[in-house]
Regions:
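Short amphipathic alpha-helical segments and helix-helix/interface helices
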Residues: 27, 77, 115-119, 157-161
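Membrane-embedded alpha-helical bundles that form conduits across membranes
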Residues: 1-5, 10, 163, 170-171
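Internal gly/pro-rich beta-alpha loop/helix module
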Residues: 130-171
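Substrate-engagement module of ASCE P-loop NTPases
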Residues: 112-133, 155-156
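Loop/turn-to-beta-strand initiation segments
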Residues: 36, 84-87, 124-130
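Conserved ATPase-coupling elements of RecA-like P-loop NTPase cores
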Residues: 92-115, 139-142
Length: 171
């Protein structure tokens, strides 16, 4: 039986506080110490500093997914499972995965969220380092909506955060 991987989450209070940069900095430290680290998917949102921090780390090619007349790039879950790194970086836990989901895929068909991909990686014995903002926590959706006037459409069940082996706050 495969030992379940560990999950570390960089948790921030808002977009742009440095979660992804903190995750990438940790990845460089681990990689420099000889650990098998792979960038599964990192969203740089056009930020040069974030993009530069990906340099020097192995990066899994993204999967191009046709959707509503366009193409989107997503984590290639099957390739990640096949590569089976010791540690994989998976940015933005709350992200909704775009595209078709079928029985031949490792990705659950019922509700394709990036956190589902993280669970598949953990179940395969791969350690995952990820990021999320606090407003994406499912139990806070009503509070966030009341304060901001905007309901979060992409949420992460509280259990996912409870399942994390380590949570690091970034503010």
């Amino acid at each position: 039986m495969t030992k379940r991987g560990t999950l570390k989450v960089y948790l921030g209070f808002a977009p742009g506080v440095g979660k992804t940069c903190a995750m990438l900095s940790e990845a460089h430290d681990l990689y420099d110490r000889g650990r098998d680290v792979l960038i599964g998917i990192v969203e740089d949102h056009g930020r040069e500093r974030t993009r530069k921090l990906t340099e020097g780390l192995p990066i899994l090619p993204r999967k191009s997914v046709p959707h509503r007349g366009g193409h989107y790039e997503e984590l290639d879950l099957e390739a990640a499972l096949e590569a089976h790194p010791e540690i994989i970086l998976v940015d933005e836990l709350a992200h909704t995965v775009v595209g078709e989901h079928n029985a031949d895929s490792s990705r659950p068909a019922e509700a394709a969220k990036r956190w589902h991909d993280v669970y598949a990686l953990l179940d395969a014995g791969i350690d995952v380092i990820s990021t999320m903002n606090i407003q994406h926590l499912e139990s806070l959706n009503d509070v966030v909506s009341a304060v901001t006037g905007t309901r979060q459409l992409e949420t992460v069940p509280d259990q996912v955060l409870r399942d994390a082996d380590e949570i690091e706050l970034v503010d």
